[in-house]
């Protein structure tokens, strides 16, 4: 048996790097949630909440490219499977569902709500220097900053 990476420096995953994991099986735990059991290249198993990635159409007994999102102070590894359509740093066009305002702690931001390829609704903050008026029904070009829990985090292109 291989001990977890935080005890054994030869078998250590690094934050921000992408590795190929084996999707071994889907299990349902006592909390009623389905989890993917993923095995890293060093033979260590990790569990990943399935509901965030259901739309990816991942199947057991397949290889899945995952980025190590972060490793917390207890050594728990947080993985982000590679999105089948969006890649960080690329641009894509999204349909606008709604435009409006969101109040933050000490300010009010203009925001738009867009839909991604899987019909997830994603909020995008409009930068203050952006002067165009964006209406529902329009299409906007956004840059994918990163993927978090199966959804792209977007910024509006000027």
Regions found by a protein language model. Name each.
Residues 1-158:
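Single-stranded RNA-binding regions, centering on S1/OB-family and related RNA-binding modules
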